[in-house]
């Protein structure tokens, strides 16, 4: 659930706060 989850969360752009440490991005946080 790395790329698939990332794409899904990125699409929503609101629930990307659980994998910011794993990806080092935090799209939802920004």
Curated annotation (Swiss-Prot):
Keywords: Metalloenzyme inhibitor, Metalloprotease inhibitor, Protease inhibitor, Serine protease inhibitor
Keyword Protein transport: no
Record-linked InterPro entries: Kunitz_inhibitor_STI-like_sf
Gene Ontology BP term (one): negative regulation of blood coagulation
Tree of life domain: Eukaryota
Protein function: Potent inhibitor of serine proteases plasma kallikrein, plasmin and coagulation factor XIIa. Weak inhibitor of serine proteases trypsin and coagulation factor Xa. Does not inhibit the serine proteases chymotrypsin, elastase or thrombin. Inhibits kinin release from HMW-kininogen by kallikrein in vitro.
Source organism (scientific name): Paubrasilia echinata
Molecular function per GO: serine-type endopeptidase inhibitor activity
Record family assignment: Belongs to the protease inhibitor I3 (leguminous Kunitz-type inhibitor) family.
Keyword 4Fe-4S listed: no
UniProt name for this protein: Proteinase inhibitor CeKI
